[in-house]
C-alpha cells in the first residue's frame, strides 16, 4: 500500500471497544491424546498445570495493572475441576471478573458446578464436541461419552453459560449418517440455546 494521506487516515480507533480482554494460561499442552490432534506430538506432550491460586493471583495483578476484568483462557483444555477451583477463588474474593475457556466433556461437571462457574463470571465455555457418535468418538480416542455431552451442554446452558462447539466431519470411516447426526445435534443445541 502506498503511503498516501488517505492510507494514514485509516488508522483504526479502538476507543469505542469494550474493556481490554487479556489472555491467561492455567496449563500448557493437553492431557489427552486424541487421534486427530497434533498438539501432544508437536509440543512434547508434557501436560503442565499452574496452581489455581497462582492463576487467580495473575488475574488480580493484570486487573490492577491494566484495569481489565475480562480474561480469555487460552489453555488447550481447561479441566472442569480446575474451572471449579478458579470459580471458588473468584467467588470467595468478591471480585468481579468475566472469563471464558475451553474444556472437555466430563462426568464430574454438574449443574452445581456450572452455576458456581457462572457466578464467578464465566460467560462462555468452548467444548471439543468433534462428533456426536460414540463409535467415532472412540476412534478419535476422545475419552468422551455421548451421555456426558448431553448432560454437560444441558447443565451449562441452564446455568446461563453459552457454549461454543468444535466439531469435524469426515474422520476416517465416519459414515454419512454419522456426520449428519452430528450436524443435527449441533442444530438442536443451537435451537435449545436460544
Where are these regions (language model features)?
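Glycine-rich phosphate-binding active-site loops on the catalytic face of alpha/beta enzymes
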Residues: 194
Amino acid at each position: 500500500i502506498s503511503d498516501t494521506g488517505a492510507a494514514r487516515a485509516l488508522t483504526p480507533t479502538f476507543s469505542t471497544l469494550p474493556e481490554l480482554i487479556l489472555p491467561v494460561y492455567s496449563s500448557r499442552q493437553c492431557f489427552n491424546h486424541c487421534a486427530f490432534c497434533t498438539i501432544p506430538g508437536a509440543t512434547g506432550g508434557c501436560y503442565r498445570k499452574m496452581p489455581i491460586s497462582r492463576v487467580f493471583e495473575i488475574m488480580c495483578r493484570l486487573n490492577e495493572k491494566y484495569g481489565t476484568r475480562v480474561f480469555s483462557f487460552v489453555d488447550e483444555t481447561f479441566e472442569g475441576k480446575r474451572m471449579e477451583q478458579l470459580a471458588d477463588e473468584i467467588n470467595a474474593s468478591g471480585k468481579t471478573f468475566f472469563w471464558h475457556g475451553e474444556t472437555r466433556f466430563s462426568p464430574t461437571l454438574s449443574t452445581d458446578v456450572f452455576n458456581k462457574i457462572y457466578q464467578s463470571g464465566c460467560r462462555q465455555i468452548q467444548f471439543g464436541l468433534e462428533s456426536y457418535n460414540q463409535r467415532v468418538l472412540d476412534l478419535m480416542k476422545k475419552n468422551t461419552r455421548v451421555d456426558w455431552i448431553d448432560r454437560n451442554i444441558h447443565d451449562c446452558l441452564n446455568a446461563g453459560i453459552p457454549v461454543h462447539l468444535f466439531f469435524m466431519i469426515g474422520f476416517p470411516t465416519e459414515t454419512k449418517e454419522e456426520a449428519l447426526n452430528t450436524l443435527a445435534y449441533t442444530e438442536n443445541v443451537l435451537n435449545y440455546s436460544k
